């Protein structure tokens, strides 16, 4: 049965690998030097795949690539290109721009030996491609060009093994940005040779002579891609991993066991668990590794459109830069912003870079010798930090332990080897990380930076183990000393922790205080017109929107950006504005509760509400950064393994292995496992995919005649191209959720983390309006020369001298009384525990605090917080990278003097990224941000059908060195706020690399006028004709008379009222009146104030109306109101 959400797509028949030949241009090299991964001693540069930078504007990211030749038919497979490309020729000048970080290649080799990872070995029998001859064949001088290769995910193993054949006869001239380039197709060797002859270890004479093989390129792929995948999958035999991937793509081996016979089991010997538990753990490990490896290939070899950020010329920072210098400055700033996220991934012990170990953590409540069930096993399995197990003994496929020769022993402290391991021992990745570490803040641990100073003085001895005293100002040794206090600890015990990852956010998010509660479903909106008798659900957003509409009408908030725009002129003005706003909020709360009753919305819906946001899982979401692409692959592999735990645990419990060989057992079970897993996790609450169907599976194409080309003749022939698979799943996004209400146990109300204590009278400067008091201090007290903080402290101490001109004392008393009143009123009902930093947050918090307290909620909620990156300047003495040469100082004083001299000579202060609190959390997602967060993937069984569902729970970011904003203030204060707060680290990319989409509700001029007109209609005016007020408002900024249609819009369709107003307006136009001020209009119509005139007494009637709602607009909403207290009235 076809998927109802299936999308029909098309893709061109084309090869999935291209060589690009660029002219060697200084400006291009400058840009690439900032965006790429490179190391001074490696000729290969890893760059992002961006249109108009590395590929042409109409580049096809997904293709049907010819893979097998059956005489009269070519079989094609769908694959998408990797988000990176590899510059392999002409890079001497480019890598020369890289900062020198010491001998990173040697460090990576030492790391592989220490942690038992495979090293790349150059095949001695393979012939290296002649790049000069290739350039000459397309009419280019090899010395004046720079070349890169872009390849599809399915072709990466072929590229590594030199099994791609360049066809210079099919060269194409393309325009890439400002440069005229040549691109050369690379065809799979499987088109020219039989499957039996295609392997990593041997090749035919044709492949030997014509194959595109570069040892340096293969080595880069070996570490950047394959070693990284291997460490994530706990599979140390990288060569077998590559061979398995090659066979999987060329021979459709997804449903066969490929890795298990060569797999070893790391991290099990060090766990204190029983023999039975070890068996379970090894079996589950083999299953999740195999399933994840098979399925990640299916997802990556699928259909993906280019993301919005892939067009380099459309980046706002590029489009708005007038000179090359401006462009480079903006790109460098972008790179610095990314260092905020890299810092989290490096310094958090629960980072995705470290958490590859599958551990068995027995349940404390589990009875001894109890029968193992799927639920018990699943609850005991977790991915955790692997750094403490890298040198452990391993088990082989026959469950025999293999002793590892490790002379160094276990490490107790994080070292440069661990950093290289986290970078998959790729020198280019490690160089990028060190560049960022050299530009991160130093966290002092009580030694007043003397450790850094002493290190720099000791550098003069040229004894550095990494650079031999050649570049200590920028080498990895100095970087490790600088951030030594921030590096993660090596865990001694296994524990369950969230996985910290960096992903690109999607626009839509339900992240306000109550998240999904009171959200009107789209399906219901469609049904409203069909059946008005249906019981409708509560629309909470409608009431919050009414408050924001009030703010927009009164010019308190910018209707587009949401920023504060109101202007305070005096204390009385301040009190009037805030009092009016709080009154509006309380009225909306009352209406919301009445609506809650009317729609019969139970209180339990509030307790069960969820906050959620989505992160993009398409391969091109983070294509602007090769480091994030490296991290992306780890995230997808880890998540697939986590999802596979459900199937694996059930299968292992039901069908245990009775023999010695794990791989033999897995071969017997794999067909069943693969079929079960293939659909077990889709539409289960976490991973969202898109089903696509390719429009045509058979094409008649002009394709290279492979048999003739092999014999030396180039001929294109019309041949049938048939697609292997029509329908497939594409990754779309993860849904991350948070429960605002603590429901972890029955005794949750006794949990000190969520229990609200009795508070005393609060200082307004630490309350809900503190941001306003600071912001408008100069306008509230224009003649006071002391700071806001000092003035309010004097108010609290009753110590304000009369020499301070604070204004009218009675007015000040009223103002102070109001500030204390609103602060303490808010504090009494505050269970969100967020101090507002802008008006929109104040509205959100005040509304929901009032709403929840009225419904009887008293304990604190879990709240979401954002830290956004910003750039700040720093003291250069802590950044040796500013030095222009190797440090040669005999004392600390000499170093400090030298740095001061550099500053005097004009060397700018170093700029680094820092994190600051985001006042409006929701803007993180509307501003299209890169987000770093913790994720716990919970699994639970549905009571309805006993199927397992997933819940992507937002978790914490571990470690004390990630950022100072994440650390608790002091344990002595008994402030458990940090336990209730979950933080996301973000960099907003709207108007940086993403064009801003105006999706916000924009208030047009006519809407603003309409709002003010309706306000006049609905409010009482004692002495002025409301119709004259409407005319004055409508004509304020107009030169021409509005039409009847305009007036009907302004008065919301009240035809009689519009006709009456137009009658007056026409009379004014006939009299040629130009001044439409209210004073002039009154004089024209000779209106007389009735304030002093006798009046009729309707007090008895009005008193009844006042009891019901204080105005005609509230009558229908307050028909069930009584004299009961508000809390009791609104109890459900």
Curated annotation (Swiss-Prot):
Source organism, top-level taxon: Viruses
GO cellular component assignments: host cell nucleus
Parts of the chain that traverse the membrane: none
Localization in the cell: Host nucleus
Predominant localisation class: host cell
Keyword DNA-binding listed: yes
Keywords: DNA replication, DNA-binding, Host nucleus
One of the record's GO molecular function terms: single-stranded DNA binding
GO biological process: DNA replication
Region forming the signal peptide: none
Region (Required for nuclear localization): 1112-1132
Function (record text): Single-stranded DNA-binding protein required for DNA replication.
Quaternary structure note: Homooligomers. Forms double-helical filaments necessary for the formation of replication compartments within the host nucleus. Interacts with the origin-binding protein. Interacts with the helicase primase complex; this interaction stimulates primer synthesis activity of the helicase-primase complex. Interacts with the DNA polymerase. Interacts with the alkaline exonuclease; this interaction increases its nuclease processivity.
Record-stated family: Belongs to the herpesviridae major DNA-binding protein family.
Protein name in UniProt: Major DNA-binding protein
């Amino acid at each position: 049965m076809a998927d109802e959400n299936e999308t029909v797509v098309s893709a061109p028949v084309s090869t999935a690998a291209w060589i690009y030949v660029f002219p060697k241009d200084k400006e291009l090299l400058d840009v690439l030097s900032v965006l790429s991964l490179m190391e001074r001693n490696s000729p290969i540069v890893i760059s992002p795949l961006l249109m108009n930078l590395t590929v042409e504007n109409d580049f096809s990211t997904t293709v049907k690539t010819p893979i097998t030749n059956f005489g009269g038919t070519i079989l094609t497979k769908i694959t998408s290109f990797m988000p990176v490309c590899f510059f392999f020729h002409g890079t001497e000048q480019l890598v020369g721009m890289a900062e020198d970080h010491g001998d990173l290649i040697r460090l990576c080799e030492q790391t592989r030996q220490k942690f038992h990872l495979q090293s790349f070995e150059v095949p001695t029998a393979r012939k290296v491609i002649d790049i000069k001859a290739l350039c000459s064949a397309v009419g280019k001088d090899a010395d004046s060009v720079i070349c890169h290769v872009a390849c599809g995910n399915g072709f990466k193993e072929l590229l590594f093994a030199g099994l791609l054949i360049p066809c210079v006869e099919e060269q194409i001239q393309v325009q890439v940005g400002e440069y005229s380039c040549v691109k050369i197709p690379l065809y799979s060797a499987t088109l020219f040779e039989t499957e039996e002859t295609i392997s990593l270890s041997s090749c035919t004479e044709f492949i030997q002579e014509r194959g595109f093989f570069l040892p340096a390129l293969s080595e880069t792929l070996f570490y950047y891609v394959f070693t990284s995948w291997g460490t994530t999958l706990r599979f140390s035999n990288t060569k077998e991993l590559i061979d398995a991937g090659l066979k999987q793509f060329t021979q459709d081996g997804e449903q066969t066991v490929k890795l298990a016979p060569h797999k070893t089991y790391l991290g099990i010997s060090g766990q204190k668990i029983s023999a039975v538990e070890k068996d379970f753990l090894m079996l589950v490990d083999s299953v999740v590794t195999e399933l994840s490896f098979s399925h990640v290939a299916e997802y990556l070899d699928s259909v993906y459109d280019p993301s919005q950020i892939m067009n380099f010329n459309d980046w706002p920072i590029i489009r708005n830069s007038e000179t090359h210098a401006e462009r480079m400055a903006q790109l460098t700033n972008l790179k610095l912003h990314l260092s905020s996220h890299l810092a989290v991934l490096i310094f958090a012990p629960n980072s995705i870079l470290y958490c590859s170990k599958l551990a068995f953590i027995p349940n404390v409540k589990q009875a001894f010798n109890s029968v193992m069930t799927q639920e018990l096993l699943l609850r005991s399995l977790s991915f955790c930090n692997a750094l403490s197990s890298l040198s452990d003994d391993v088990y082989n496929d026959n469950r025999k332990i293999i002793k590892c020769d490790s002379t160094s022993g276990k490490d107790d402290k994080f070292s440069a080897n661990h950093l290289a391991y986290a970078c998959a021992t790729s020198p280019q990745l490690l160089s990028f990380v060190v560049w960022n570490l050299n530009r991160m803040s130093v966290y002092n641990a009580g030694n007043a930076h003397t450790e850094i100073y002493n290190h720099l003085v000791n550098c003069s001895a040229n004894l550095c183990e990494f650079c031999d005293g050649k570049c200590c100002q920028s080498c990895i040794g100095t970087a490790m000393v600088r951030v030594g206090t921030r590096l993660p600890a090596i865990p001694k015990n296994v524990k369950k922790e969230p996985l910290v990852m960096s992903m690109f956010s999607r626009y839509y998010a339900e992240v306000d205080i109550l998240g999904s509660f009171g959200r009107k479903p789209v399906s219901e909106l469609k049904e409203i017109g069909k059946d008005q008798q249906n019981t409708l659900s509560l629309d909470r957003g409608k009431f919050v929107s009414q408050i924001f509409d009030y703010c927009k009408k009164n010019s308190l908030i910018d209707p587009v950006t949401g920023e504060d725009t109101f202007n305070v002129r005096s204390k009385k003005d301040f009190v009037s504005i805030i009092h009016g706003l709080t009154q509006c909020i309380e009225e909306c709360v009352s209406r919301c509760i009445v609506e809650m009753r009317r729609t019969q919305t139970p209180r339990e819906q509030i307790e069960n509400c969820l906050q959620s946001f989505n992160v993009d899982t398409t391969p091109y979401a983070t294509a602007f950064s090769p480091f994030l692409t490296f991290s992306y692959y780890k995230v997808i592999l880890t998540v697939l393994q986590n999802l596979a735990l459900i199937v694996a645990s059930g299968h292992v419990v039901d069908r245990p292995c009775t023999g010695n060989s794990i791989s033999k057992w897995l071969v017997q079970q794999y067909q069943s496992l693969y079929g079960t897993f293939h659909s077990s996790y889709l539409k289960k609450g976490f991973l969202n995919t898109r089903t696509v169907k390719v429009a045509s599976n058979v094409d008649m194409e002009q394709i290279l005649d492979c048999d003739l080309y092999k014999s030396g003749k180039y001929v294109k022939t019309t041949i049938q191209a048939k697609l292997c698979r029509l329908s497939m799943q594409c990754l779309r996004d993860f849904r991350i959720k948070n429960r605002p209400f603590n429901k972890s146990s029955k005794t949750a109300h006794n949990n000190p983390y969520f229990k609200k204590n009795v508070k005393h009278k609060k200082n307004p400067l630490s309350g809900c309006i503190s941001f306003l008091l600071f912001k408008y201090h100069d306008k509230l007290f224009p003649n006071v020369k002391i700071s806001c903080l000092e003035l309010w402290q004097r108010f609290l101490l009753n110590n304000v001298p009369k020499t301070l001109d604070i204004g009218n004392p009675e007015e000040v008393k009223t103002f102070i009384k109001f500030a204390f009143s609103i602060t303490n009123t808010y504090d009494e009902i505050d269970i969100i525990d967020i101090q507002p930093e802008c008006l929109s947050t104040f509205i959100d918090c005040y509304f929901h605090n009032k709403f929840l307290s009225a419904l009887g909620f008293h304990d604190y909620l879990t709240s979401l917080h954002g830290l956004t990156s910003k750039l700040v300047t720093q003291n250069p003495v802590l950044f040796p990278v500013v030095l222009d040469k190797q440090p040669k100082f005999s004392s600390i004083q000499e170093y400090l003097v030298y740095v001061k001299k550099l500053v005097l000579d004009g060397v700018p202060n170093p700029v680094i990224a820092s994190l600051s609190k985001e006042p409006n959390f929701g803007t993180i997602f509307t501003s299209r941000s890169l987000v770093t967060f913790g994720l716990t993937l919970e699994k639970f069984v549905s009571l309805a059908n006993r199927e397992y569902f997933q819940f992507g729970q937002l978790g914490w970011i571990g470690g004390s060195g990630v950022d100072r904003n994440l650390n608790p203030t002091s344990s002595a204060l008994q402030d458990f706020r940090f336990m209730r707060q979950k933080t996301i680290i973000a960099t907003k990319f709207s108007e940086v690399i993403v064009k801003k989409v105006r999706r916000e509700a924009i208030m047009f001029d006519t809407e603003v006028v309409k709002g003010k007109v309706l306000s006049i209609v609905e409010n009482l005016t004692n002495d002025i004709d409301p119709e004259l007020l409407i005319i004055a408002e409508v004509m304020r900024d107009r030169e021409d008379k509005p039409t009847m249609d305009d007036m009907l819009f302004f008065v919301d369709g009240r035809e009689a009222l519009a006709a009456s107003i137009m009658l007056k307006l026409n009379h004014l136009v006939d009299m040629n009146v130009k001044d439409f001020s209210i004073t002039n209009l009154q004089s024209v119509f000779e209106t007389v104030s009735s304030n002093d005139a006798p009046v009729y007494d309707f007090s008895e009637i009005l008193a009844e109306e006042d009891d019901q709602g204080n105005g005609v607009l509230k009558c229908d909403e307050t028909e069930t109101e009584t004299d009961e207290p508000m809390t009791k009235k609104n109890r459900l």
